[in-house]
Amino acid sequence: MAAQAAGVSRQRAATQGLGSNQNALKYLGQDFKTLRQQCLDSGVLFKDPEFPACPSALGYKDLGPGSPQTQGIIWKRPTELCPSPQFIVGGATRTDICQGGLGDCWLLAAIASLTLNEELLYRVVPRDQDFQENYAGIFHFQFWQYGEWVEVVIDDRLPTKNGQLLFLHSEQGNEFWSALLEKAYAKLNGCYEALAGGSTVEGFEDFTGGISEFYDLKKPPANLYQIIRKALCAGSLLGCSIDVSSAAEAEAITSQKLVKSHAYSVTGVEEVNFQGHPEKLIRLRNPWGEVEWSGAWSDDAPEWNHIDPRRKEELDKKVEDGEFWMSLSDFVRQFSRLEICNLSPDSLSSEEVHKWNLVLFNGHWTRGSTAGGCQNYPATYWTNPQFKIRLDEVDEDQEESIGEPCCTVLLGLMQKNRRWRKRIGQGMLSIGYAVYQVPKELESHTDAHLGRDFFLAYQPSARTSTYVNLREVSGRARLPPGEYLVVPSTFEPFKDGEFCLRVFSEKKAQALEIGDVVAGNPYEPHPSEVDQEDDQFRRLFEKLAGKDSEITANALKILLNEAFSKRTDIKFDGFNINTCREMISLLDSNGTGTLGAVEFKTLWLKIQKYLEIYWETDYNHSGTIDAHEMRTALRKAGFTLNSQVQQTIALRYACSKLGINFDSFVACMIRLETLFKLFSLLDEDKDGMVQLSLAEWLCCVLV
């Protein structure tokens, strides 16, 4: 329940601008300025209670408490490591990024690329901090997280061994911005060890809020050089790596001194005149620093002697910093994949710079409710979250073209908070999405999920080529104008997870989550049915009614259990007393806590209707319905509910094996009827909103 309330609170805060880079969320409620002032007033250096300098901050396995790798580690402040520590020395540069004993080269490559764009850098690394004025042992950084910016506060105690920083450090021994940035990112993800292993674009996106694309260099686009050049000019961040065929090859060094599975950052491209012909060059950087490419165009390679000496002086900087040049043709041969985090994605496909429009959806895959798996599982696939976008305006550069006009969209599906789960053995889920064009007759269909039959009848217009266990999968699609349904999913069903779905479109797109409507029109027996004489029913009622001709919750329990216990077509262990109390609460019109004959007859007819729906929805006649079938049952019962409510129902009423027995089903129906009835009574002006005091709200939810 607390999670649902927190989600509602976040949504309301976002509508008021909270979560922008200028108004970042305070991670764990810590405010940098307030905490720093408290430390300055008290004369005490900050010690972060939320990320203490202790073994748990290091890791949980290889860097866990008691691990040989963590023996001898001492946490020290920069003021204890050198006489005159500096936050940044001479501006932040790529050489400030030197890898330590943590396998987070992917992150370091992203940080190195970040230094190429000062505006981006200082969004992540605020300028208002140093070791001189107002120093209080506290620093702060900002990161993009799933659609919103968060401010992370840390103290400056860093893990050291033998007097040296253990992890990320700068070539300048007295410069600490990069080490502190790594610590803040470790805090955001739970610990340092959680940063081991990843994709460079993950860091790119968390530093910029951009969206990433991947290029397979075994099948490079013909205009690869132009793509890279324009991306760098647009301030985009680029990384590349060499794939390995087995774990044994990881970090292996090739004969020409390239490190396999290592994350390199792309820092520049140039074209030179080489022996009378243009030669395209690309500049890369290895965060390790010590290992550099030894092939053509490397430091001291003979190729440099055959170009204009002035160009050679400009480009050939002989520094052992891990940065080097190579030809574009060698780059394509040697590397496997290129990753680009687009800050202005349209600059890659058009000479003109346009501001793309962004639509952001947040959602959950909840086991038993909205975790339907991929198209290989048609029985549950349709229960995945569904989002609709409408594309009306075609791309500008195609409005006058002869071919079919199209709308370019860039889709990115990102799973949330998976690094936190590494410590409990849960890695990234395999995720993907599919895009379906909505037929004209269904374009106005937004109140409920499209069902199984739709997905059996229609094929996707665009989709991820494969499901992969990366934090984000993304891709471009060129679609004719129209209405489209986007379905994000995990590969296998019943996998819990959170996600955000981003849709960039060149022209503005209308967006709506399918099934976002909440409404209820439950079955009400006709008065003639209630008034109809039934001798058997009357004898049953009189048998358990008291002298006042009223039935209590205990009597109701006995009566109903006796009536339904003989059925063999449903699994029924009996109604519990709380369900019976809910029944009375719904129909007790005079507040006595009991039911009269007419009220009981109404209840009896409702339960018969619930039984009919339950039996119809139990497609495999197992005697129970599963949580995915519950969505259909609710619709049959007259309830239109959004995904959040569906997920809450699955969490509350389904058992561990995702089955819902008849008692739980009836309890859910009764509870929903009660809540809709209460809301309708309180919503006097019928605007879909009610305002209650705390006492009034408690009385309602405790009914």
From Swiss-Prot:
Binding, Ca(2+) 2: D618, N620, S622, T624, E629
Location in or out of the cell: Cytoplasm; Golgi apparatus
InterPro entries reported in the protein's UniProt record: C2_III, Calpain_cysteine_protease, Calpain_domain_III, Calpain_III, Calpain_III_sf, EF-hand-dom_pair, EF_Hand_1_Ca_BS, EF_hand_dom
Pfam families to which the protein is assigned, alphabetical: Calpain_III, Peptidase_C2
Keyword Repeat recorded: yes
Tissue-specific expression: Stomach.
GO cellular component: cytoplasm; Golgi apparatus
Domain notes per entry: The domain III mediates oligomerization.
Similarity comment text for this entry: Belongs to the peptidase C2 family.
Protein name according to UniProt: Calpain-8
Lineage: Eukaryota, Metazoa, Chordata, Craniata, Vertebrata
